[in-house]
Amino acid sequence: MEAENDEYHKKERAIAVTILVFASLAIASLFVAFSYYCYIRNKVAKRLKNRTYTESACEDKGNSFSNLKVIAEKGLQVFTFKQLHSATGGFGKSNVIGNGAFGSVYRGVLQDGRKVAIKLMDQAGKQGEEEFKVEVELLCRLRSPYLLSLIGYCSESSHKLLVYEFMANGGLQEHLYPIKGCNNFCPKLDWKTRLRIALEAAKGLEYLHEHVNPPVIHRDLKSSNILLDKNFHAKVSDFGLAKLGSDKAGGHVSTRVLGTQGYVAPEYALTGHLTTKSDVYSYGVVLLELLTGRVPVDMKRSPGEGVLVSWALPRLTDREKVVEIMDPALEGQYSMKEVIQVAAIAAMCVQPEADYRPLMADVVQSLVPLVKQLQPTVKPGSSSSFHTTQSPSPHATQSPKA
């Protein structure tokens, strides 16, 4: 009987030890899990805090422009109206280099000798004021070598001005075909330079679409909004019509149709449904301009040739006919392999169905190797090779469009 009691107590002790071990393991596991949870939570919280701090300078704080003082801390220079009035010669007509729906752009020289482009927003109408706020809020956080840089701003009473870097060679369109005010003296760009510009413009759009959350839709990309510096490096400009996309999957904005004839995507023109693929279509039109040297819409041409996309699209995928669309000024500068590759990219970008168009990241990846093999090796300390088929033009003095 005593032996049975000893055996019973041994079993009880074994069970107790087992329960204690499992309980200890469970508690330890819970502690580890809780510690990991706290670690992850703190890590995420820090990221959110950093993100909030980074973007807080661009948040809208009521209808006033007091937040511009915060934006100034992010590297933008604050100008007085008197300074900019002096820089532009009293906003004289001789210094006007662009006009738009929300104001005019003037050539200016600051006291330190820097050349700038100054956008004077229209004082009449609420829309102009809202446009100013949108541009400042966007541009204070959009920084890329392929986007036009905002140097500073002025906000005094009813005076709202933006100060941009000056682009010595003006808009891309000035170097592709004759335009009013250029007197046909603007130099034509060579093949290598056109492809380089195509890549840089694509990188600008890629940044807006892929590296900003939520993505920014330009909505009015065109050759006149792709500006060239003194070395013919390209930067995308004019975010006056830019819209922040939805943060939902496949984000889009629905709004009244704005844009420029010949560049507007079909689905946007018909429904007002705007997505990043709408920008891709506009980019495709610019790519066609680079290939053909033609304006997007010219009803003075022969029947069937007035609309660039309609005329070029059937030829872009035909190896025998694709050469028919090429700008005569480029003759002898390209290989058929290069033309076919670029034509294929353009054809995908201007597809009528938005879903069939590529992402701008795909466009960039397609152009990078092509441009790389065409560009000569640049020695350290020397500038990149950018060329025109004529001498530099004194008429190319444009900077951002209004």
Where are these regions (language model features)?
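A short, aromatic-enriched beta-strand patch in the conserved N-lobe beta-sheet
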Residues: G152-Y153
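Intrinsically disordered, low-complexity cytosolic regulatory tails
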Residues: M1-R13, T18-I27, A45-S66, V70-E73, ...
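Activation segment
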Residues: L241-K243
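C-terminal lobe substrate-recognition/regulatory segment of protein kinase catalytic domains
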Residues: L313-D355
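Conserved catalytic-loop aspartate of Hanks-type protein kinases
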Residues: D279
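Membrane-proximal cytoplasmic juxtamembrane segment of single-pass receptors
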Residues: K11-L138, L142-L148, S157-V163, N169, ...
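Protein kinase catalytic-loop region centered on the HRD/HxD motif
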Residues: K203-V216
